[in-house]
């Protein structure tokens, strides 16, 4: 009888794993979620839906922002590009604050609600700036200088949208990923697809923004476009709230900075103690005692920090668990600090890619403005920002081919369930960004030569179709690197910091926007010092964007070499198995397997 009880225990554990979600998440009532009623794609679709509307609004504004600044606010090229980069930089750095608030205090769902409300406030103010008489851009339809009140209202509105995006982006994407349990084999595979399809939905929003919304802004009016964006965001917010019973929630875990500081203090305090060669002698909780995420295995890098987990006196009656966390840390806490330190070089060497990516919404669009955008045989003129749709289409096509064709083939060839490692995917995209800059330099040189041949005649311009290759190739780069960065930072950060993980990925683009401004200023100044003429004039025909693109290509090539070296030395995190159950065939199956802890870049 006892023998039968032992035999059934593994099966009972397996049945519980299939019925319940055992990853410390809760349902809308605060209870352990039922797998069949919560999470997975039934919840993720609501989340992807509101992301569609957020990207619709963001790109409806950002891709046409340089046009707005030069035509409505009458700023010159350099000032318009810099203001666009400043706004983009702030917008993509704000998620660091939003992710911190989500992980530490409000939770991801609560942060999404607050951020979306602020986002809507920005959209409403943007709409009012076009319809309230005192806030309108001009007294008449034609004016040389816009009202100061309109300019102030406009910038307040778009920076409110920045704040909203700061809470929305990291919380929503990580909240969507939380709907898939890492410890469940089927849901873990779904999560790998989730990031690809998240970006497909995101690109659908971008595609609609740069075609429909941009056309409305150019041909009907910015005010009408703002009304549409506000209505779409409000509607999707309402639908997102309807999905509340289907979501899985994670409670905020408090400030992540305190445990990190505790590890450093403990390691310094015990710097003179020997570190045991056997990592099992270091202090760690059991799976049953640890309720906030998963336990991590000890790694061989940054061994100095392991001293924080050294137990000073094993003969003491006081249990190690009751010692001050400022004196004794767990292996998991130590490894979480190591993870964040190891991410710094990866983050830094992806900035060059971010600089290349920022060109698509600034200089690429400005090029399109002065080129022939007529559709052959018709009088229809394509709005310049609509060329950004080529990037969205390229991402959708590339992600689909990668997910449906390349991953199955690569999975069989490499044995990696992702097909290739995350860092390999990022590296491939960086190579495509290099190609995009080379193509952009060649096309811009051709455009300048064409303009000189026709004596800068504004009626004789090169067709904008020549810009298609640089947009398309940059889209392929985004499909590999941006999606890879999302997955990398979400997967490799500590479980309690996953909103911040998404913020780290976005901060690459934010920091790159400021780096781009610095490069514009420095390169323009140096060119003027050397040759007497800068690379950025009042308009494109008096500028030398081709040389700027060549400079970016050279920097990207050097950066790729550095990235490969860092990636080859990178150590992925390893998660301890939390439960072993018996599968149908009788083999042991780990329900929380860790990523291989050796670099898989090569």
UniProtKB/Swiss-Prot annotation:
Positions where Phosphothreonine occurs in the chain: 111
Where's it found, cell-wise?
Membrane
Keywords carried by this UniProt record = Membrane, Phosphoprotein, Transmembrane, Transmembrane helix, Transport
Keyword Transmembrane helix belongs to the record: yes
Q: InterPro entries recorded for this chain?
A: MFS_trans_sf, NRT1/PTR, POT_fam, PTR2_symporter_CS
MF terms from GO for this chain are: dipeptide transmembrane transporter activity; tripeptide transmembrane transporter activity
Keyword Transferase (UniProt): no
Q: Which stretches are transmembrane?
A: 56-73, 87-107, 112-132, 152-172, 197-217, 220-240, 337-357, 381-401, 422-442, 465-485, 500-520, 548-568
Question: May I have one GO cellular component term?
Answer: membrane
Q: List the disulfide bonds.
A: none
Q: How does it sit in the membrane?
A: Multi-pass membrane protein
Q: In which tissues is it expressed?
A: Expressed in shoots, stems, leaves and flowers.
Gene3D superfamilies listed in its UniProt record: MFS general substrate transporter like domains (1.20.1250.20)
Q: What is its main location?
A: membrane
Which residues, if any, are the signal sequence? Answer: none
Family to which the UniProt record says this protein belongs: Belongs to the major facilitator superfamily. Proton-dependent oligopeptide transporter (POT/PTR) (TC 2.A.17) family.
Name it. Answer: Protein NRT1/ PTR FAMILY 5.7
Traced from the root, the source organism's taxonomic lineage reads: Eukaryota, Viridiplantae, Streptophyta, Embryophyta, Tracheophyta
């Amino acid at each position: 009888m006892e023998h039968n009880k032992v035999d059934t225990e593994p099966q009972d554990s397996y049945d519980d794993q299939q019925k319940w979600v055992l990853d410390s998440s809760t349902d809308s009532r605060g209870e352990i979620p039922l797998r069949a009623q919560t999470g997975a794609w039934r919840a993720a679709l609501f989340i992807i839906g509101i992301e569609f509307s957020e990207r619709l609004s963001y790109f409806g504004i950002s891709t046409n922002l340089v046009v707005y600044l030069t035509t409505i606010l009458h700023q010159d090229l350099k000032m318009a590009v810099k203001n666009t980069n400043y706004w983009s930089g702030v917008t993509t750095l704000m998620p660091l604050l939003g992710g911190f608030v989500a992980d530490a205090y409000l939770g991801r769902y609560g942060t999404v609600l607050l951020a979306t409300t602020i986002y809507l406030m920005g959209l409403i103010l943007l709409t009012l700036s076009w319809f309230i008489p005192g806030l309108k851009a001009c007294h008449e339809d034609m004016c040389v200088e816009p009202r100061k009140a309109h300019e102030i209202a406009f910038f307040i509105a778009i920076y409110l949208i920045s704040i909203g995006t700061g809470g929305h982006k990291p919380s929503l994407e990580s909240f969507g990923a939380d709907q898939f349990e890492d410890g469940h084999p089927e849901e873990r595979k779904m999560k790998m697809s989730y990031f690809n399809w998240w970006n497909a939905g995101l690109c659908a929003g971008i595609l609609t923004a740069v075609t429909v919304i941009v056309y409305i802004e150019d041909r009907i009016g910015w005010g009408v476009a703002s009304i549409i964006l506000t209505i779409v965001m409000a509607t999707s917010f309402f639908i997102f709230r309807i999905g509340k019973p289907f979501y899985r929630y994670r409670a905020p875990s408090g400030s992540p900075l305190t445990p990190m500081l505790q590890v450093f203090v403990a390691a310094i305090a015990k710097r003179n103690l020997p570190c045991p060669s056997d990592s099992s002698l270091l202090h760690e909780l059991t799976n049953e005692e640890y309720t906030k995420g998963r336990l991590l295995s000890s790694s061989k890098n940054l061994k100095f920090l392991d001293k924080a987990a050294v137990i000073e006196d094993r003969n003491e009656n006081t249990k190690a668990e009751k010692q001050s966390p400022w004196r004794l840390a767990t292996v998991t806490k130590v490894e979480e600090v190591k993870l964040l330190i190891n991410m710094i070089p990866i983050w830094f060497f992806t900035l060059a890619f971010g600089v290349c990516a920022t060109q698509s919404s600034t200089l690429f669009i400005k090029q399109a403005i002065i080129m022939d955008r007529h559709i052959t045989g018709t009088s229809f003129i394509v709005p310049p920002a609509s060329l950004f749709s080529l990037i969205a289409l390229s991402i959708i096509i590339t992600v689909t081919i990668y997910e449906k064709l390349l991953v199955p083939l690569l999975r069989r060839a490499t044995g990696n369930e992702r097909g290739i490692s995350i860092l390999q995917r990022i590296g491939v995209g960086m190579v495509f960004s290099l190609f995009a800059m080379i193509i952009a330099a060649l096309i811009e040189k051709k455009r300048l030569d064409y303009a000189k041949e026709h004596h800068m005649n504004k009626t004789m311009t090169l067709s904008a179709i020549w810009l298609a290759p640089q947009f398309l190739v940059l889209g392929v780069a985004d499909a590999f690197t941006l999606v890879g960065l999302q997955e990398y930072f979400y997967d490799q950060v500590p479980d309690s910091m996953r909103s911040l993980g998404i913020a780290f990925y976005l901060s690459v683009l934010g920091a790159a926007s400021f780096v781009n401004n610095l490069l514009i200023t420095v390169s323009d100044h140096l060119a003027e010092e050397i040759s007497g003429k800068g690379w950025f004039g009042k308009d494109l025909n008096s500028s030398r964007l081709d040389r700027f693109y060549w400079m970016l290509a050279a920097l990207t090539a050097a950066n790729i070499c550095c990235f490969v070296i860092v990636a080859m030395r990178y150590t992925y995190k390893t998660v301890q198995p939390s439960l072993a159950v018996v599968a149908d065939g009788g083999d042991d199956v780990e329900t929380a397997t860790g990523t291989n802890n050796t670099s898989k870049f090569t």
